[in-house]
């Protein structure tokens, strides 16, 4: 029987930052589509990661593991991928979702106060780390049909205020790398490389950024500047990732898909 194009049966995935928020929603949704094996990463909360895997198992996940991984580890790519391959007892990674990101409000500063160490930390975590993971995954992609999906941000398309400026630049760098990877490796690897450009979404990161502004600012911003007049939910993003992960998205490559409910500030940047 031919497998339905939306099905992820018999496929294996890595989802970074899968213990909570968008990453958790992505992990759960992929298993709703039949994903067989899954590795998720966490930074400190193993219990949250195991909770995600428990939900995934309810959806029929055959094998799932949680891997502690730090985006600031210069060897994150090799270490993570080797642990995933061994733990899932597989030679192949069909789907890679780079969702984990870094933004520390205690270090956020205006451009006049920006220091090289802070700049390097944000760029390493949000640009180098996902590229390192992709590089380590490439030899283990399937002969055809591999999927690499990077979670980006509407901040990559905007002129951002000082505290978010470096974060936005790091995500713009990730977008650029993704387009280049699609151009460079789509033929050789028969894989797709795409980003999902996420607007205001209710996650821990959303609340972290919210601390940089007056109380309620982020919620009111989303209502005022989003056509949907609400803040996004993690599942909204997971649905788009689920599409990109499947055969249905085989003709989408090098794209940055907007997932922002019609965020008006971003719309001119996409034209």
Curated annotation (Swiss-Prot):
Keywords of the record: NADP, Oxidoreductase
EC annotation from Swiss-Prot or TrEMBL: 1.1.1.1
Any single GO BP term: secondary metabolite biosynthetic process
Catalytic activity: a primary alcohol + NAD(+) = an aldehyde + NADH + H(+); a secondary alcohol + NAD(+) = a ketone + NADH + H(+)
Key word Disulfide bond present: no
Cross-referenced InterPro entries: NAD(P)-bd_dom_sf, Sc_DH/Rdtase_CS, SDR_fam
EC top class named in words: oxidoreductase
Positions contributing to NADP(+) binding: 22, 70, 99, 167, 171, 203
UniProt key word Oxidoreductase: yes
Any Pfam family the entry gives: adh_short_C2
Pathway: Secondary metabolite biosynthesis; Alkaloid biosynthesis; Mycotoxin biosynthesis
Superkingdom: Eukaryota
Molecular function as annotated in GO: alcohol dehydrogenase (NAD+) activity
Residues annotated as catalytic: 152-153, 167, 171
PANTHER family, per the entry: NADPH-DEPENDENT ALDEHYDE REDUCTASE-LIKE PROTEIN, CHLOROPLASTIC-RELATED (PTHR48107), RE15974P (PTHR48107:SF7)
Family: Belongs to the short-chain dehydrogenases/reductases (SDR) family.
General function of this protein: Short chain dehydrogenase; part of the gene cluster that mediates the biosynthesis of the aspoquinolone mycotoxins. The role of asqE within the aspoquinolone pathway has still to be determined. The first step of the pathway is catalyzed by the nonribosomal peptide synthetase asqK that condenses anthranilic acid and O-methyl-L-tyrosine to produce 4'-methoxycyclopeptin. 4'-methoxycyclopeptin is then converted to 4'-methoxydehydrocyclopeptin by the ketoglutarate-dependent dioxygenase asqJ. AsqJ also converts its first product 4'-methoxydehydrocyclopeptin to 4'-methoxycyclopenin.
Name the record gives this protein: Short chain dehydrogenase asqE
Organism: Emericella nidulans (strain FGSC A4 / ATCC 38163 / CBS 112.46 / NRRL 194 / M139)
Lineage: Eukaryota, Fungi, Dikarya, Ascomycota, Pezizomycotina
Gene that encodes it: asqE
